[in-house]
Amino acid sequence: SGHHHHDSSDEPSESSKACCDHCACTKSIPPQCRCALRLNCNHCRSCICTFSIPAQCVCTDTNDFCYEPCKSGHDDDDSG
């Protein structure tokens, strides 16, 4: 089992800018926004990752805004 899992060629360097696919904000003022699901913890001060394969990382940082989604602009539908 080789540990070569570097498929980051087709997406713009994820490490260079913070992004978030699932962001949840509270209704308080100011809002408290958390990124619900991330594949890594690049722009995250406090991060919790599961031990599953692949690991799912939850960023527990709280901001008053949401980063833009990590997914690139094109729709990719997995419906088949």
Curated annotation (Swiss-Prot):
Residues flagged as site, Reactive bond for chymotrypsin: F51, S52
InterPro entries the record matches: Bowman-Birk_prot_inh, Prot_inh_BBI
Keyword Coiled coil: no
Disulfide bonds: C19-C70, C20-C35, C23-C66, C25-C33, C41-C47, C44-C59, C49-C57
Reactive bond for trypsin (site feature) positions: K27, S28
UniProt modification remark: Binds calcium, probably through His-3 to His-6.
Biophysicochemical property: pH dependence: Stable at acidic pHs. Inhibitory activity is unaffected after 1 hour at pH 3.0 and 96 degrees Celsius. Inactivated after 1 hour at pH 10.7 and 96 degrees Celsius.
A GO CC term attached to the entry: extracellular region
GO molecular function, one term: serine-type endopeptidase inhibitor activity
Record key words, sorted: Calcium, Disulfide bond, Protease inhibitor, Serine protease inhibitor
SMART domains: BowB (SM00269)
Family: Belongs to the Bowman-Birk serine protease inhibitor family.
Function: Protease inhibitor with activity against cysteine, aspartic and serine proteases. Highest activity against serine proteases, in particular trypsin and trypsin-like proteases.
Protein name: Bowman-Birk type proteinase inhibitor
